[in-house]
Amino acid sequence: MRITSRLVVVFLCLGVTAYAADEMIALKAERMFDGTSKTLVQHGVVIVQGNKIVDVGSNLTIPNGAQVIDFGDATLSPGFMDAHTHLTLDFTGNFNERRLAELTTNVSEMAIRATVFARATVEAGFTTVRDVGSRYVGSREFVDVALRNAINKGLVVGPRMLVATKGIGATGGHFDPTSGYRDLLFGREADYTDGIVDSPEDVRKAVRFEVKNGADVIKAAVSGGVLSLADEVDTPQLTPGEMAALVDESHRLRKKVAVHCHGDQAAREAIEAGVDSIEHGSFMKPETLTLMKNKGTYLTPTLMASEWIMSKIDNYPPALQLKARAAYNARSEMFRNALKMGIKISFGTDAAVFPHGQNAKEFALMTGLGMTPIDALRTATSNDAELLGIAQKAGTLEKGKLADIIAMPGDPTADITATERVSFVMKEGKIIRNGPRAPQSAAVSSDPPDISMPVD
């Protein structure tokens, strides 16, 4: 990378490099992915002023006085997006230690840890995330809302966040925070204020309660999960009537709906109800994928989550091992079928199941199952922007859009793992990172106990 002309920088107290609002910056690289094209643009140039892109193209003439950053043999790209994260939760270590930690760790401590996870994520090149669930046993705190607001105010360095707060699910289901514990250990049954519902009326109350408390998107569990003790992985957990109420109330309030779903029947009923995305989708059959295609529903496959769980399978109880293996064995065929059928695929990882900041490993998993590298890049840029409802301002390198820009070495269409070596991150015109990443804390880079609720 070469920096030419005089580069005036201000180091903010949180370590973000900011430029004066009227200063023009030119970013150059041998290649550029604009977020939509089927091939890379050669000799890419992006001109930034303030928080916006003011010009972009190949071999652009750089305005006089602009500060130039030339990355050489590298590729510019829109900032990546991850449509399935849990930034306020910790990733899974030993399952039994995690269960104990759920009862002993202060939620305030997790809020502080979340700031570390947020920074690790944005420094990895992910400038936007859809954070789809934040809950703690016995607590009604909205930590994800607080983290989003702190990032928006510039108090914390992190990605742009769209948050789902607690998530919605059935009594005894995947999202029930008391499930798997002794009856009434917490003094009461979970209710709609915890996201737990047992009727269409409960669903509407829960949606309204979460929107009232800051939800940008609504998340629900419509089938069992891998990392929950008291359910089967593919059983339906909401009735068709409850799912209809979920979609109707959420869309009435102009919120999109993402549903955790492994099972085929639950996926089919959710798609028919009109949800916006299916998260995981492990056991979906071709007939259900056809319905998905016809409805325009997105698939967020979260391949990295199942990959991580299988690599640590001995850390889980036997019942969870059986569920994990079943989901893992089914997901590859489902994903290949989705590719063949032209299903809309978004990039989402389930970060928290694995260490935060390793999100980009999802790219290699997708290409390993047959997706082309350029299409994989598109999932994390323009596809995610469409799903998240922010395509008018982010997701592509276009004049007038927010200056969320990253650089990675070499050519990611020749070596997709280049996405794991992002060297430069700009978010809304501010440089978050330029050069090697700072050493990660133990909380991000090693295997401490996961003190989250089940998320997969």
Regions found by a protein language model. Give the residues of each.
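His/Asp/Glu-enriched, well-ordered alpha-helical/loop segment
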Residues: 100-102, 252-256, 316, 326-412
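Histidine/acidic-residue-rich catalytic or RNA/ligand-binding cores of hydrolases
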Residues: 91-94, 144, 173-175, 228-230, ...
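Active-site gating loops and adjacent loop-to-helix segments of metal-dependent hydrolytic enzymes
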Residues: 88-110, 171-191, 226-238, 295-328
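Divalent metal-dependent hydrolysis catalytic cores, especially in the metallo-beta-lactamase
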Residues: 113-141, 157-167, 215-228, 256, ...
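C-terminal cap of metal-dependent C-N hydrolases
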Residues: 380, 386, 399-443
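Metal-associated gating/positioning segment near the N- to mid-region
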Residues: 74-153, 174-175, 241, 265, ...
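Histidine-rich, glycine-flanked metal-binding segment
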Residues: 32, 36-77, 100
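Histidine/acidic residue-rich metal-binding segments in metalloenzymes
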Residues: 146, 201-299, 326-345, 392
